[in-house]
From Swiss-Prot:
Pathway: Protein modification; protein ubiquitination. Keywords: Nucleus, Ubl conjugation pathway. Restricted to inflorescences, especially in the inflorescence meristem (IM). GO terms for cellular component: nucleus; SCF ubiquitin ligase complex. It comes from Arabidopsis thaliana. Gene3D superfamilies: Potassium Channel Kv1.1, Chain A (3.30.710.10). Involved in ubiquitination and subsequent proteasomal degradation of target proteins. Together with CUL1, RBX1 and a F-box protein, it forms a SCF E3 ubiquitin ligase complex. The functional specificity of this complex depends on the type of F-box protein. In the SCF complex, it serves as an adapter that links the F-box protein to CUL1. Residues 90-153 are annotated as: Interaction with the F-box domain of F-box proteins. InterPro entries: SKP1, SKP1-like, SKP1-like_dim_sf, SKP1/BTB/POZ_sf, Skp1_comp_dimer, Skp1_comp_POZ. This is SKP1-like protein 5. Belongs to the SKP1 family.
């Protein structure tokens, strides 16, 4: 019987998972190794909806070691995630330091950006599609445009 780890999402939902699944996250792995995971690990930046997706991914990657099987499963798994929360999954993968999931979500976003789905859309339309808040001021946008003028020609 494997050791269990309790994770608590930002919206208060608890998830009890196997330690080997939790250790797919380098951040959680460090907490376990440092003895900080004695009770519940609070994940203040990850909602229960997103955490469930991350846990599903980690469980599959712990249980299956066949590279080809995982590639096919990963592709199918990404198709089940709504594009409006894909960015949140990416941010959770980054926060939890799960490099393989971060790489997968980045590739999926890149593929979507190159596909007809987002072709010809403005930055504001793309942000709306992925439910990304624009937290830059007009001055910051102007500075970025000035520093990267070559990209806007």
């Amino acid at each position: 019987m494997s050791t269990k780890i309790m994770l608590k999402s930002s919206d208060g939902k608890s998830f009890e998972i196997d330690e080997d699944v939790a250790r797919k996250s380098i951040a959680i792995n460090h907490m376990v190794e440092d003895g900080c995971a004695t009770d519940v690990i609070p994940l203040r930046n990850v909602t229960s909806k997103i955490l469930k997706i991350v846990i599903d991914y980690c469980e599959k990657h712990v249980k299956s070691k066949e590279e080809e099987d995982l590639k096919e499963w990963d592709a199918d798994f990404m198709k089940t995630i709504e594009t409006t929360i894909l960015f949140d999954v990416m941010m959770a993968a980054n926060y939890l330091n799960i490099q393989s999931l971060l790489d997968l979500t980045c590739k999926t976003v890149s593929d979507l950006l190159q596909a007809d789905l987002l072709s010809g859309k403005t930055p504001d339309e793309i942000r709306a599609h992925f439910n990304i808040e624009n937290d830059l001021t007009a001055e910051e946008v102007a500075k970025i445009r000035e520093e990267n003028q070559w990209a806007f020609q």
